[in-house]
């Protein structure tokens, strides 16, 4: 029985030496730390409804019509243009009385 307890003792001792973190070390969750800043609060955006305004129009401004100042120019005489007398085509003439069939 002494050899059995001695072998178990050697086994546990070698396990403590060979395993770097040891048996007592197990995973611990990180300690709770309160946040340094407050999280942003999601507030609904408060937008006022648009106000229906008529479009801004400038009032009409009365402007007198623009008149050019009179310019004193001597009257210009048109040069006479020679036009040949107008000749009527023979189709527009009245037929002679003897060829007229209308009474």
From Swiss-Prot:
Biased composition (Basic and acidic residues): 45-103
Keywords for the protein's UniProt record, in alphabetical order: Cell wall, Nodulation, Repeat, Secreted, Signal
Extent of the Sequence repeats: 34-38, 39-43, 44-48, 49-53, 54-58, 59-63, 64-68, 69-73, 74-78, 79-83, 84-88
Region annotation 11 X 5 AA approximate tandem repeats of P-P-[QVHR]-[TNKH]-[KED]: where it falls in the sequence: 34-88
Region (Disordered): 34-103
Alphabetized InterPro entries for the sequence: Proline-rich_CW_protein
Subcellular location: Secreted, Cell wall
Source organism, top-level taxon: Eukaryota
GO cellular component, one term: extracellular region
UniProt keyword Amino-acid biosynthesis, yes or no: no
Induction data: By soluble compounds from rhizobium (in cells through which the infection thread is migrating and also in cells that do not yet contain an infection thread).
Extent of the signal sequence: 1-24
GO biological process terms on file: nodulation
Tissue localization of expression: Root nodules.
Membership in a protein family: Belongs to the plant proline-rich protein superfamily. ENOD12 family.
Function: Involved in the infection process during the plant-rhizobium interaction.
Protein name per UniProt: Early nodulin-12
Organism: Medicago truncatula
Gene: ENOD12
């Amino acid at each position: 029985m002494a050899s059995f307890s001695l072998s178990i003792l050697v086994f546990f001792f070698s396990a403590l030496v060979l395993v770097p973190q040891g048996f007592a070390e197990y995973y611990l969750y990180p300690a709770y730390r309160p946040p340094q800043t407050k999280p942003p609060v999601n507030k609904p955006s408060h937008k006022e409804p648009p106000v229906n305004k008529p479009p801004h129009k400038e009032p009409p401004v009365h402007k007198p019509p623009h008149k050019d100042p009179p310019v004193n120019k001597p009257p210009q005489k048109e040069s006479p243009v020679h036009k040949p007398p107008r000749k009527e085509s023979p189709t527009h003439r009245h037929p002679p009385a003897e060829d007229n069939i209308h009474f």
